[in-house]
Each structure stands twice: as structure tokens, then as C-alpha cells.
């Protein structure tokens, strides 16, 4: 797997687990809310979750997302692009 494919996989899984979180919780986390919680611009989260994105993310931000969504960090590396 190359860098672009890895970035796509991570982005796909961030979106998947954010939407899954929203189905299970009353307090929804939108892209805007997630970006606010991370302290990044919303365009970064939108680009990350985009189906054709190759936007990367820092390991620190990925760690923060895993804590916010209550998902083990290794889950973001599972699956196919």
C-alpha cells in the first residue's frame, strides 16, 4: 500500500466511524464539530473524508479522533481502499 492509498483508507475509516458514532449517540459529531474539537480548519476534515482524497493527517490528530469517537486507533488502518 502506498502513501496515497493509506491516506484514502484512513479518511474512509474516519468517515465510517464518525457516522457510526452518530447513529449510536444523541450528540452528533459533524465535520464542523470534529474540526472544532481538533482545532483544525473544517476543510481538512472534509478533504480527509472525501472519497477521492489523498489528504494526510498527523498521527496526533488521528489519535485525537480515536479518543473523540471512542475507536481504537488501529481500526483506522483496517479494510481496503
Residue ranges and their predicted role:
Residues 52-64:
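Short, basic-rich loop-to-helix N-cap that marks the start of a DNA-contacting helix
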Residues 18, 35, 66:
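The alpha-helix within a helix-turn-helix
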Residues 1-27:
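A short, Lys/Arg-rich alpha-helix, primarily the initiator
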Residues 31, 42, 59-62, 73:
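Helix-turn-helix DNA-binding elements, focusing on the entry/boundary residues of the two helices
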Residues 57, 70-81:
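Short C-terminal boundary/hinge segments that cap the last helix of small helical domains
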Residues 12, 28-29, 57-60:
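Residue-level signal for the short linker/turn that defines the boundary of a DNA-recognition helix
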Residues 25-48:
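Short alpha-helical DNA-recognition segment
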Amino acid at each position: 500500500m502506498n502513501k496515497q492509498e493509506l491516506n484514502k483508507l484512513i479518511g474512509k475509516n474516519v468517515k465510517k466511524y464518525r457516522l457510526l458514532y452518530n447513529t449510536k449517540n444523541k450528540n452528533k459529531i459533524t465535520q464542523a464539530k470534529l474540526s472544532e474539537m481538533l482545532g483544525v480548519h473544517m476543510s481538512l476534515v472534509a478533504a480527509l473524508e472525501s472519497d477521492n482524497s489523498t489528504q494526510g493527517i498527523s498521527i496526533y490528530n488521528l489519535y485525537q479522533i480515536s479518543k473523540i469517537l471512542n475507536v481504537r486507533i488501529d481500526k483506522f488502518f483496517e479494510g481496503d481502499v
